[in-house]
């Protein structure tokens, strides 16, 4: 099966306006920050936000960036520290389901395909629970993943279904787990890798490309966001296009979680999403120094 790349086209005017306003209000100069290593750039950026009170002492962050052309990890901050997973756990549920399909224990037909699309593209919690039920529920699903894919779920904690209100706070994962999953996925080492990539490329909101002003139109993205009143995150693969006609894939994973439930969900999640976009901007500029990108 061939992978069909699905570029996500941003709303250019809104993206430019939003990015400009955020830059003026909260972001340090990215052009001035690209001289050091990417890890130190990200660390410095987050520390500057903390110093201004834009990220509070109740919030924790974790980041991982990997160049898939060379396999080099370019940034690792709190890589193995468990953070709230939110919907970023859903690609792992897809993996467990497709493992059972490959084993001949489940069928992947029109109904299950629709549930899978709703789970990944729309983050539908009812479909998420349906998928998890097929693999035996939270405990059995975690056991399956730990048995067959131990290197992908070292810090994964799967203990609950997703309630209708979406307030599931006890499932955990680390940015290291997400990056390991995405690396294996890109290398086609997982069952139904092409289908999982297709699902993660379906059009939808993301925090890695859309409204990230330094990333050019036509960059392909495969991702899954996670959002609760205690977590804002995104895990994804971006495929940058080079001026030489080659493609340069890389992973960006960012998670910001709060130890307390925030009261103003809308504004909190929007501002944290913009922080992740700025880290994605930093990453693209760093990759542009490594390769002849557009």
Q: Which residues are covered by each model-predicted region?
A:
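Structured C-terminal helix/loop/strand segments within mature extracytoplasmic catalytic/sensor domains
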Residues: 33-50, 55, 74, 186-208, ...
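Mid-domain, small-residue-enriched loop/turn segments at the edges of structured enzyme/sensor domains
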Residues: 60, 132-189
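Bacterial N-terminal signal peptides that target proteins for export
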Residues: 2-16
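Active-site SXXK
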Residues: 71, 82-106, 119, 252
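A conserved catalytic-loop motif detector
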Residues: 168-223
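Second-shell loop/turn segments in exported
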Residues: 33-36, 76-84, 102-106, 114-118, ...
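Bacterial N-terminal signal peptides
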Residues: 14-25
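Short, conserved catalytic-motif segment at the N-terminal edge
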Residues: 57-83
């Amino acid at each position: 099966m061939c992978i069909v790349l699905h570029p996500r086209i941003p709303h250019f005017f809104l993206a430019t306006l939003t990015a400009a306003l955020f830059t003026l209000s909260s972001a340090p100069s990215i052009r001035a920050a690209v001289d050091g290593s990417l890890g130190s750039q990200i660390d410095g950026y987050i520390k500057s936000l903390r110093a201004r009170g834009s990220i509070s002492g109740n919030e924790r962050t974790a980041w991982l960036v990997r160049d898939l052309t060379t396999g080099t990890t370019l940034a690792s901050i709190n890589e193995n520290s468990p953070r709230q997973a939110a919907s970023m756990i859903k690609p792992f549920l897809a993996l467990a389901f497709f493992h059972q399909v490959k084993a001949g224990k489940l069928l992947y037909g029109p109904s299950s395909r629709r549930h899978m699309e709703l789970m990944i593209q729309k983050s539908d919690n009812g479909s998420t629970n349906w998928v998890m039920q097929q693999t035996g529920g939270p405990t059995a699903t975690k056991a399956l993943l730990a048995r067959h894919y131990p290197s992908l779920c070292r810090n994964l904690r799967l203990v609950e279904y997703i309630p209708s209100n979406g307030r599931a706070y006890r499932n955990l994962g680390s940015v290291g787990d997400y990056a390991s999953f995405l690396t294996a996925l890109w290398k086609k080492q997982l069952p139904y890798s092409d289908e999982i990539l297709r699902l993660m490329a379906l059009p939808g909101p993301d925090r890695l490309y859309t409204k990230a002003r330094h990333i050019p139109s036509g960059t392909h993205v495969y991702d899954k966001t996670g959002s609760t009143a205690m977590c804002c995150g995104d895990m994804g693969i971006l495929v940058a296009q080079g001026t030489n006609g080659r493609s340069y894939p890389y992973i960006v994973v960012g998670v910001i979680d709060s130890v307390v439930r925030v009261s103003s969900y809308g504004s909190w999640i929007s501002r944290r999403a913009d922080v992740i976009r700025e880290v994605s901007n930093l990453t693209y500029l760093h990759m542009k120094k490594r390769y002849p990108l557009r």
